[in-house]
């Protein structure tokens, strides 16, 4: 008889590797090439050892090639790949999606995601989607979908294109995707949801440092939320992971990490006991979240915390 293990929070955890961490210029000295490659191999091995099975990638820079040279063997990972902009033409989008797999050293990918919802809403949206469907039919990608935010109307796009996966920014500070019913609508359509920007660009971790200019007016609200977490003796990383991982409609929670140390911190927080908190009381007001815009829908890195 095969023993079935209990579900673990790590089952939902996915990683996106930050190859060039965005930090203060004087706070970080870039590693030499050989050390950088070894650090990446160590990060991926740490992810594999922790039970992470999904890696989210992006086509810009040299990140795909670096990953392709650093996978552990045998590799336990599936990958999601993003398209380049449709401004380059649908032929270029298709060719680059194929090239991404070559650079990653993989015969196929788990999911191919349209980078911007605007690409689907435009005049060539249907032609673009047809190319993705053709790549899926040829077995190069198991699933196809798109990335969007709440302002893009992701449920409406999902009804039109019937994706397998939608990637959305969801975090403790900005809970609009949940409370506007988008998650429920996508679940009813049978669409898998991948959550990104789960750490809201590290805003909950900033203490004693200036906030980004666009968030300076929300300092009091952020301070109030941090104070409530401190009074409950809950680490901000633990709280935001628990919130997103606790959403039943979310099948993957993508954390952007720049090192094995950051990943270990994420894994420890994900495995911590789920706190009993009033999640809705820990969000920014919806109008505030909407005004904050990209600050809450950034890359979800934890550089400010690690």
What is each residue range found by the language model?
Residues 1-77:
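N-terminal binding-site loop/beta-alpha segment at the start of enzyme catalytic domains
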Residues 5-9, 67-78, 98-107, 157-161, ...:
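Acidic (Asp/Glu)-rich catalytic clusters
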Residues 9, 36, 117-296, 300-306:
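Beta/alpha (TIM)-barrel catalytic core signal, keyed to glycine-rich beta->alpha loops juxtaposed to Asp/Glu
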Residues 19-38, 82-91, 116, 121, ...:
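Active-site mouth loops of central-metabolism enzymes
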Residues 31-47, 89-105, 148-157, 237-240:
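Short, acidic/polar
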Residues 54-66, 86-91, 119-123, 172-178:
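Acidic-and-aromatic substrate-binding clefts and catalytic sites of carbohydrate-active enzymes
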Residues 64-82, 130-139:
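Alpha-helix-loop-beta-strand connector modules within alpha/beta enzyme cores
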Residues 101-120:
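Active-site groove signature of glycoside hydrolases
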